[in-house]
UniProtKB/Swiss-Prot annotation:
S-adenosyl-L-methionine binds at Y686. This is Histone-lysine N-methyltransferase set-25. Residues 1-12, 88-97 have a biased composition (Polar residues). Its EC number is 2.1.1.-, 2.1.1.366. It comes from the Eukaryota. Zn(2+) binds at C645, C700, C702, C707. Residues 200-214 have a biased composition (Basic and acidic residues). PANTHER family: HISTONE-LYSINE N-METHYLTRANSFERASE SET-23, HISTONE-LYSINE N-METHYLTRANSFERASE SUV39H. Its main location: nucleus. GO terms for cellular component: heterochromatin; nuclear lamina. It is an enzyme of class 2 (transferase). It comes from Caenorhabditis elegans. It catalyses: N(6)-methyl-L-lysyl(9)-[histone H3] + S-adenosyl-L-methionine = N(6),N(6)-dimethyl-L-lysyl(9)-[histone H3] + S-adenosyl-L-homocysteine + H(+); N(6),N(6)-dimethyl-L-lysyl(9)-[histone H3] + S-adenosyl-L-methionine = N(6),N(6),N(6)-trimethyl-L-lysyl(9)-[histone H3] + S-adenosyl-L-homocysteine + H(+).
Length: 714
C-alpha cells in the first residue's frame, strides 16, 4: 500500500539535430509555417532527476546508457570514460541539438556552458565536459573485464541506425525498456488503473513494481519531511529530528528538482507580465535563447504533453515557452517519457468526462429553447457552457499559467510520493487561476509548535500509560493487530462519549457506518510503537494523497472547486488539509451560533461549536481547540473544496505521526463518505445540518436536493 506516485525518475525530452534538408528553425505549434516544413521528430530519453538539460555540453552518443546492476561503481565510471573516448569517432553521426546556420547542421563541442550543471548517469555525478584522464591515471586502471566489453559492444551495435537521409549511420541511445528498469534510470510509474483497482482498492502487482526495492521505498517515505517549523533560530534541521525543517521565514520557492526552470528564472529572456504566483517561475527561455542555452543539450525535461490533430504528441518543455513545442510519436513518448504520458491520459480522461456532462446539460438548454420557439443547435449550446482547454500559440495566454501550476505543484507532491494535481478551466471566458503558496506539508508557527510539544497527546505511549495496566484491543485493520496501541491511546486521551473514534477496515478505508456529520470525530493512526510497517492500513494519511485531483473552475457563482480525476471509494483518503498551523488569535471574534426558541425568538447557544470567522480556517474540536490550520495564503488544493448541503466528503481530525519521537501536530484530512466518480465535484458541509443557524441573505448554490437555501450568518 505504499504510494507509487513520485517514485520514478523524471523523463526528459531530447532535441535532435536536423538533417541538411530541413529548415531547422524552432516554431510554435499551430502555425501555418510548421505544416509546410518537414520538421524531424524529437526523441525522448529518460534520465535521472539531475540529468542533462539545455545548455549542457553533452554529445548525443554520451546520452543515457544502461549498465547491469552487478557492475561495481569503479568499473561503471571507467566504462563511461571509455565510451566518451570512443565516441569521438562517431562525431559526425551524433544527433545533438544544433544551432542552424545557413540551413546546415553544425555541432559545436568546444563551447562549454557556464550554467550547465553536472549530469547524473546511473546515480553517479559526472561534471559536464569531463576531459580524458591522463596517461598516469589510465595506467592505474585494472585490466578491462570482458563482461564490460560485451556490454559496450552490444550498446554500440544497438545504437546504429541506417535510416538517416544522408545515408550515414546515426547514433541513437541504446536504452531498452527492460534495461532502464534494471539500471534504475527510468522507473516507470504504475498506471493509475492498476494502482487503484476498483475490484480490490489496493495496489496491483506489476512488473515495474516488482523491480522496485520495497525497502528503499519504505526508507524514502520514512525520511520525508513531516512539517516546516518557523522559528527565529534560522534555517536548518530541527535538533535530533531530520524530518523537521526549520526556517526563519517561510517562502514558497521553485521545486529544487526543477533545475531547468530555475536556470531559466536566472537567464530566460521571456518574462510573465502581471501577477507573480508563489513558487512558479516568472521567466522562461524562448526561441531567441536557443543558441546560448539550448543548442548543446541532448536532453530537455518534459513538463506536459498534449495530443495534436495529427495523432502526434506535443511536448511542452520545463523552463521553455510554448514557442519550442514539438511533435513526437505516441510510441516514442510511451517508451521514454511514460510519466508525462500517463499524466496526459489522466487529464484528458477527466476533461472528456466533464465534457460529456456538459453535453447533457447542453441538451436540456436546447430543449428549453425549443419550447420557447428559439432554434439552437447542440454545438452552439455546448459552446455556451464548455470550451475545451487546448494549447495556445501565445506564451502570454492564461492557459500556460494553468500548466505551470499543475506541473510545479505536482513536482512538490512527487517529492512526498503523492498523486498529481491539475488546474483546469473550460469556462467560456478567460479566468485567471488562483494565486497562493502551495505546500504539501503543514507550516507550523513557533507558538503553536511549543503548545503541541507540551500537550498530553504528544507523550509517548509508554509515558502516557505510566504504570497503568492496559489491555490491547485486537485491531482488525492494523498489520500487527494484537499489539496495536491506537485504540488504547484513544481511550487514554479522549472521552468516547464526546469524540467518535473512526476506525479503519482491513483495506485501509475509514468506516463511516452510523456516522453523524455534526459529531466530533478523530482517526487514530499507527506509529512505530504499534510494530507495524508503513504498509499498515491504519497509516493512510502518512502515505498521503493517492488519487489525482483537479482544481476546476465551476463558474462565476462558485468559483474554483475540486474534482476527482479518478474514482474514489467511500472511506478512502482524498487528501490532507494543509496550511499555516497557528494558535487561535484571542483578539479575533469567535462566531457564536444562535437557535430559535419555541416562540420563534433567537437566543445565543453557548453549547454550539465555536467557529472561526474565516472560510479558509480549519478548527479542531477534539485534539486542541486553540489551534487552527489556515489555508488562506498557504496550503494545498483542499482549500478549494466547496460547500454542499449533501457533501461527498468530510473533514476529520487525525492523530498521526510515523515515529513516537516525532512531535504530534494536529492534522486534518479529507475522507470520502460516499463513492465519488471521475469528474465529480468533491464537497464538504461547512455547517452542521443538525444546528439551525441564524440565516443570512447569502444564497446557497450547492444545487443539491438537500440544499438549505441560504447560508448561516456569523
Amino acid at each position: 500500500m505504499l504510494p507509487a506516485w513520485g517514485t520514478s525518475t523524471e523523463a526528459t525530452a531530447s532535441h535532435a539535430g536536423w538533417d541538411g534538408d530541413d529548415e531547422g528553425d524552432i516554431r510554435a505549434a499551430y502555425t501555418e509555417d510548421e505544416k509546410k516544413e518537414n520538421i524531424p521528430p524529437i526523441s525522448l530519453t529518460s534520465v535521472s532527476t539531475n540529468g542533462a538539460y539545455p545548455g549542457q555540453k553533452r554529445r548525443r552518443s554520451e546520452s543515457v546508457r544502461t549498465l547491469k546492476p552487478e557492475c561495481p561503481p569503479e568499473e561503471t565510471q571507467r566504462l563511461r570514460q571509455r565510451r566518451r573516448i570512443s565516441a569521438t569517432d562517431a562525431t559526425q553521426s551524433s544527433r545533438t541539438m544544433n544551432v542552424i546556420e545557413d540551413r546546415k547542421p553544425r555541432v559545436n563541442r568546444a563551447r562549454k556552458s557556464q550554467d550547465a550543471p553536472s549530469t547524473s548517469t546511473c546515480g553517479f555525478e559526472t561534471p559536464v565536459g569531463t576531459k580524458r584522464k591522463s596517461k598516469a591515471a589510465d595506467s592505474q586502471k585494472p585490466p578491462k573485464q570482458s563482461k564490460l566489453r560485451k556490454i559496450d559492444e552490444a550498446s554500440t551495435s544497438k545504437a546504429v541506425d541506417n535510416s538517416s537521409k544522408d545515408g550515414k549511420k546515426t547514433t541513437k541511445p541504446a536504452v531498452t525498456q527492460s534495461n532502464r528498469r534494471r539500471s534504475g534510470l527510468s522507473l516507470r510509474p504504475v498506471p493509475i488503473e492498476t494502482i487503484f483497482s476498483e475490484s480490490s482498492g489496493r495496489e496491483s502487482s506489476t512488473e515495474d513494481e516488482a523491480d522496485v526495492s520495497h525497502q528503499q521505498r519504505v526508507e524514502k517515505i520514512a525520511k520525508n519531511p513531516i512539517m516546516v517549523v518557523v522559528l527565529p533560530l534560522g534555517p536548518g534541521n530541527y535538533p535530533n529530528n531530520e524530518r523537521i525543517t526549520v526556517v526563519s521565514t517561510y517562502k514558497s520557492r521553485v521545486n529544487k528538482n526543477c533545475n531547468e526552470a530555475r536556470r531559466a528564472q536566472r537567464h530566460g529572456s521571456w518574462s510573465r507580465k502581471g501577477i507573480a504566483f508563489p513558487g512558479i517561475p516568472t521567466k522562461k527561455f524562448t526561441k531567441s535563447d536557443l543558441a546560448k542555452y539550448g543548442a548543446h543539450a541532448s536532453n530537455w525535461p518534459a513538463q506536459a504533453a498534449f495530443r495534436s490533430e495529427e495523432g502526434k504528441i506535443l511536448i511542452y518543455y520545463e523552463g521553455w515557452t510554448c514557442l519550442t513545442l514539438h511533435r513526437l510519436s505516441v510510441e516514442e513518448c510511451a517508451r521514454t517519457a511514460p510519466t508525462i504520458l500517463e499524466e496526459m491520459s489522466i487529464r484528458d480522461k477527466f476533461i472528456e468526462t466533464v465534457k460529456s456532462a456538459a453535453a447533457e446539460e447542453a441538451k436540456l438548454v436546447v430543449e428549453k429553447n425549443q419550447e420557447n420557439g428559439i432554434e439552437l443547435t447542440l454545438d452552439e449550446a455546448l459552446k455556451q457552457i464548455f470550451i475545451e482547454p487546448v494549447p495556445q500559440s501565445s506564451p502570454e495566454n492564461v492557459f500556460w499559467i494553468y500548466q505551470d501550476l499543475s506541473y510545479f505543484h505536482t513536482m512538490d507532491n512527487r517529492d512526498l510520493g503523492l498523486a498529481p494535481v491539475f488546474y483546469i478551466s473550460s469556462y467560456t471566458q478567460s479566468v485567471r487561476p488562483p494565486c497562493y503558496a502551495y505546500t504539501a506539508i503543514n507550516i507550523v508557527d513557533v507558538d503553536a509548535y511549543k503548545r503541541c510539544l507540551e500537550s498530553r497527546a504528544n507523550m509517548s505511549f509508554a509515558d502516557l500509560t505510566g504504570q497503568k495496566i492496559w489491555m490491547p484491543t485486537r485491531s482488525k485493520a492494523c498489520e500487527n493487530g494484537t499489539k496495536c496501541k491506537c485504540d488504547a491511546r484513544f481511550m487514554f486521551l479522549y472521552d468516547p462519549h464526546d469524540v467518535t473514534n473512526l476506525e479503519c477496515t482491513p483495506d485501509g478505508k475509514v468506516d463511516f457506518t452510523d456516522f453523524k456529520i455534526d459529531n466530533a470525530r478523530i482517526v487514530m493512526e499507527c506509529s512505530d510503537a504499534c510494530g507495524c510497517s508503513l504498509d499498515c492500513p491504519r497509516r493512510s494519511l502518512q502515505r498521503g494523497q493517492q488519487h489525482p485531483l483537479a482544481v476546476y473552475y465551476e463558474g462565476p457563482e462558485k468559483g474554483f472547486g475540486v474534482r476527482a480525476a479518478a474514482n474514489i471509494k467511500a472511506g478512502e483518503l482524498v487528501c490532507e488539509y494543509t496550511g499555516d498551523v497557528t494558535l487561535l488569535p484571542t483578539s479575533d471574534p469567535v462566531a457564536s451560533s444562535s437557535t430559535k426558541t419555541d416562540d420563534g425568538e433567537e437566543q445565543e447557544n453557548p453549547e454550539a461549536p465555536e467557529r472561526v470567522d474565516s472560510s479558509y480556517d480549519a478548527a479542531f474540536n477534539a485534539m486542541d481547540t486553540k489551534i487552527i490550520i489556515s489555508a488562506k495564503k498557504t496550503g494545498n488544493i483542499s482549500r478549494f473544496i466547496n460547500h454542499s448541503c449533501d457533501p461527498s466528503s468530510v473533514f476529520v481530525e487525525v492523530y498521526s505521526r510515523r515515529f513516537e519521537e516525532d512531535p504530534l501536530i494536529p492534522r486534518v484530512a479529507v475522507y470520502a463518505i460516499k463513492d465519488i466518480a471521475l469528474g465529480e465535484e468533491i464537497t464538504i458541509a461547512y455547517y452542521e445540518p443538525g444546528i439551525e443557524w441564524k440565516r443570512s441573505s447569502v444564497k446557497c448554490r450547492c444545487k443539491s436536493t438537500k440544499c438549505m437555501g441560504t447560508l448561516p450568518a456569523f
